[in-house]
Amino acid sequence: MIVAIEGMDGVGKTTVAKSIEKDLNFIYVKDPLKDLFELEKNHLEKISEKIFNQPDDKLISWYLGLEDCYALSSNKNKNIVMDRHVLLNYFWNGNENTEKIFETQIEMFGKPDLTILLTASPQTRMKRISDRDPNDPDLNKPTMKEYGYDKMIKFLDKYNFNYVIVDTETLSLSETIEKCKNLVKSRRI
């Protein structure tokens, strides 16, 4: 079973994904290109930074899409939990110029069996990021304060993803984790 944990930064994606890995015996997948190309994390970060500094949203979409495609392709018939899949890429880069890239990615490599979209208001997300690291540079980015979920949900609906929204606004981290683990258990293939 392939599960994707999605949402804007500060909703708890990594914590939830790692809990699913540990408690439900899934393989945790983040930065699959690091594994594909056998790169050290700092080397992958340098490559990513160069790509992200390009003015071409098509190039960025393909680059991030390659990660998603490799993760799905190399983990067939395994229980994996992905710390992000396609949604944040689509939120930041999805537009008329890149739509075909996202269509092709889904058409050729498929979708997760279950996508869990974690939501929270921008204020709550910024507080969580600040609590985690008061010096996080993301706190100064105006785009981090965007809501973002309307565009993501449209994408999920357009491409018929099997998804569940978990509003984390008033949930504790442990409540969010339990809710997500129960969703995975109830849909486990």
Predicted regions and their residues:
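Hydrophobic anchor at the beta1->P-loop junction of P-loop NTPases
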Residues: I5
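ATP-binding Walker
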Residues: V11
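NTP-dependent small-molecule kinase module
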Residues: S130-I189
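Walker A/P-loop
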Residues: T14
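A glycine- and Lys/Arg-enriched "phosphate-lid" helix/loop adjacent to the NTP-binding pocket
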Residues: N97-K154
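P-loop (Walker A) phosphate-binding loop of NTP-binding proteins
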Residues: M8
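ATP-dependent small-molecule kinase phosphotransfer cores
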Residues: P32-K100
